[in-house]
Each structure stands twice: as C-alpha cells, then as structure tokens.
Amino acid sequence: QQFLELLENRYYTFYLDEWVFQKEYANETLQNHFEVKNLKGFGIHEVKNGIIAAGAVLYYLSETQHNQLKHIQSVTRIAEDNYVWMDRFTVRNLELYTPNSVNAVTLLDVIDKTISPMGGRLLKRWLALPLKNIDAINKRHELVKFFIDSDDFSQTTTYQLKQISDVERLISKVATGKASPREIVLLKDSLKAILPIKSASEKSTNKTVQELGKQLHTCKDLITKITETLFDDA
C-alpha cells in the first residue's frame, strides 16, 4: 500500500489489462499496424519480450494520444553486441549530457556542431550508444574526413541543411492532423532543400555518400501538391 501511494504521488500511471501484454495480441497489433503478414522483415520475430513491449506501447499510444500513428513506420531491434551499453550512472559520471558542477562542460557541449534539430538528436543517440564494430566506426570516420576534405560538398550540404526545418516534428504533426498551413509550407520548403543535397551526394566520389544520396527520396509529387494547394504566406 505504501509503495502504491508513493508511486501515485511521484509518477503518472495508466492501467492496462493483462491481455495487452500477451504475445499473440502484441504480435497481431504490430502486424496490423505495419500491414505485414509477419515480423521477420523487422528482425524481431523471435524477440518475445520486445514484441510484447512494442505492442503495448502502440496500444498505449492509440488509447491516450490518437489513432493516427502512421508516421510510426518501423520497429528496430537494438543489437546489444553492436554497442557499448552504459547505465545512467555511467552516463552521468562521464558528463555526456549534463554537467556535475556549475562551470563544467559536457562532452555534448564540446562536439555538438550540428546545424539541424534532427542532427542534434542523432548525435545524442550516437553518444548514448557508442559503436563497437571497427568497420562501422571507420566508416563514420571516413565520412567525417570526406566532409573536411571536400569544401564544395561541405558548403553545399551545410547551406541546404540550414534551410531545412525540423522535418521529424513536422511529419509527426501531419500524421496526427495537427499541422498548420504554415507548417505544411515549411515541410515543402524543407523537402525542396533536400534535392541539392541528394544531387551533390550522388555525384560525390565517396561510395558511402553516394549510397546515402540514393536513399533520399525526391518527394516531387508531394512538393507539387503542396505548391498547388497552398500559398507560401499561408
């Protein structure tokens, strides 16, 4: 009783029935959401606890937030062997994000030179999950070296990234039906700003950059649709 009282005073709680945590229900929930016959394509079909957790999260979101969850398009298993795992005490003691004293400088403060909200979030995830695979580490280093050595490419990419709004946030608002006309215009402008990055990447001499460029979708139909529907000063 004391534990429950303490829990209720410090945290928000939301009751879920036991059937929400059954593997069969969770599996069906995920398959229906992603519109697939099985979860093999996501590499989680044998991860029982992961399936249950992901299914419960989707159910919780549908009950408490909204039914429009189509912007959640994938589920990925974090392979423990690929990353260095750190508990919250280690993260705190290393001062990765939060300083332990008033005048201290965190690692994030030192290395965060990102120029977009998406890049900032990605860097935080990379700090939280350091790579263990040497090839993957070297691949990142080679990309950094390419940006340093290729002034024209670096300048083009930097300039275009500065024209891009927080696309992840905008897409989430669109999916939930909460985006304003002005935000839709910002999304269009952001998609247009990606096109020069895609072109420069595909023409680069670095194979990894070329592959990244090929993965960028032009979204030309969407850009045209928004342009024909809304004025820029909407």
Task: Describe each PLM feature range.
Residues 1-146, 159-175, 179-234:
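Charged catalytic and DNA/RNA-contacting regions of genome-maintenance
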Residues 148-154:
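Conserved interaction-surface patches within small, structured recognition/assembly domains
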